[in-house]
Amino acid sequence: MSSQSLYKVSGNIAANALVNNDKYKTMYQESIVNPEGFWREHGKRIDWIKPYTKIKKTSFDDHNLSINWFYDGTLNASANCLDRHLAEHSDRVAIIWEGDNASEQRKITYGELHAEVCKFANALRSQGVRRGDIVTIYMPMVPEAAVAMLACARIGAVHSVVFGGFSPDSIASRVIDGKSKVIITSDEGMRGGRAIPLKRNIDDALKNPDVTTVEKVIVLKRTGGIVDWVEDRDVWWHSLMETASEYCQPEEMDAEAPLFLLYTSGSTGNPKGVLHTTGGYMVYASMTHEYVFDYKAGEVYWCTADVGWITGHSYMVYGPLANGATVLIHEGVPNHPSPARLGEMIDRHKVSILYTAPTLIRALMAEGKQHFDKFDGSSLRIMGSVGEPINPEAWRWYHEVIGHEHCPIVDTWWQTETGGILITPLPGATDTKPGSATRPFFGVQPALVDNMGNILEGENEGNLVLLDSWPGQMRTVYGDHERFVLTYFKTFRGMYFTGDGARRDEDGYYWITGRVDDVINVSGHRLGTAEVESALVSHELVAEAAVVGYPHDIKGQGIYAYVTLTRGTEETEELRQELRQWVRKEIGALATPDLIQWATGLPKTRSGKIMRRFLRKIAANEVTNLGDASTLADPAVIETLIESRLNRTE
């Protein structure tokens, strides 16, 4: 890596940061050599009802898997985000909210948020929610989404937040798997000037005959839009809040008690319920938020992620609020009604720290930097990137146009499963290289292995694994521990397999190269190819489908589908559009195929396995060096697919 591509930490930033390079090296070394001692100390950053004495009981042996942190302590996550700030910071603003329409704005102090959470926790109890129950949350980006999450945590209920862009079928599958008794939703949400029919989607999901556990649907009135109503099942949020008491004693929870479920795409097609527990997760979310973003008290912090994703959980709700931060929540998209919106909001709310995704940066880049001519940006101090590897061009644009060349960029790598950031620069410690996630956070031991599981030393490329546990790690796949072991610990014995490939350069910096399994990263969100294939094949005119990712200028990866139609079906543009809408309805807008190529046949081995590496290369327009096709049952299929490919650049 040439020195011109190295962005040095400025002396001023290093002098004022929580951690400089020397301190990073000392702390990191201690966290690896003496993890018990390191986490014994740093676990104290949150409040415990019963202090822990036991720190770490972990093993990645697939026959004796164990992940336990602070496991004899007790605490409450909601109390850590609210109650502990009341004595000194009750009047500090916890949430600044800006609606899809900028004229709608609210500020909520820690004292006010505490009262709202207590009231809603009591409201949940009035609807029969008890400790250990799973509550599904399908909400727009409004403060009440955070209130609902924290209220669940307060009474020991387990929340399962479903992204507001998911379809009724996707909601139903998650409700069925989690056996939810109560769903919290809104009449509608607002996004990009459009009303999103959240309540209608819930109604449709609950028509699924396999949904049998739901007793109550609590509905927030957001837009006042007309909704259908089911008596004895549906209840208005505001009606419950009118009579609810303003104090609710937080439940004392074991450190290893479940805090939330969050469903993520897997390569098998069935979304898997990632289970996070309370103690280790809260320690890790709060610590990474403070150190990675170099957070200082009183700063306004804006994470643009939706609450339905892990980034929204860890870095919009639990991490920042545990640290007493002022969090900006935006209901809409930061490039509506114009690309200038992002800059306007940073200036309007004096944002110090911005955490966003490469897909938004690329979208703004495509619109042109003239939209930032009036952008001041002087409040901005730190910028982050999350969701997928950021390409160097987008990194530089972000640095120059949004950061005015003075804000460090923390390009963070982590996963739903990891609970928090694992590989990242620290603003005062790490010289950065555009496109590299750089170095591991404290306590994180990444390694590269070949396909046989042999550790690769030095400058190299391979499968990214982790050699030991960290407090924020998921504990299991809900209801399917065997799948958890199989997915993450069987591929490479004694190691956690991330599913990502990476290379390590001459400076020891990590560069994430993308998924090595059948998962596509669309706009920073993971989609299993099997999930999209299943949706396509469920259409009566589709005989077979194979889905791969391909390079997309805005989204990072687009969805490229190869579809074989039933015999005698005509290949028309109308049918292509019908299939796109079909997938959209089955899964959600995020899963809509960008390109659908008609295929008379797919490249298969004699045993019937589809050889996806050929399909990926054709979709990426890399057709000159496809490699050995001799194992295919019908090698001629490849030529036909190349001839009719849709992603040509010539």
Swiss-Prot record:
GO terms for molecular function: acetate-CoA ligase activity; AMP binding; ATP binding; metal ion binding. Its cofactor is Mg(2+). It is an enzyme of class 6 (ligase). Acetylated. Deacetylation by the SIR2-homolog deacetylase activates the enzyme. Keywords: Acetylation, ATP-binding, Ligase, Magnesium, Metal-binding, Nucleotide-binding. InterPro entries: Ac_CoA_lig, ACAS_N, AMP-bd_C, AMP-bd_C_sf, AMP-binding_CS, AMP-dep_synth/lig_dom, ANL_N_sf. One of its GO terms (biological process) is acetyl-CoA biosynthetic process from acetate. This is Acetyl-coenzyme A synthetase. The gene is acsA.
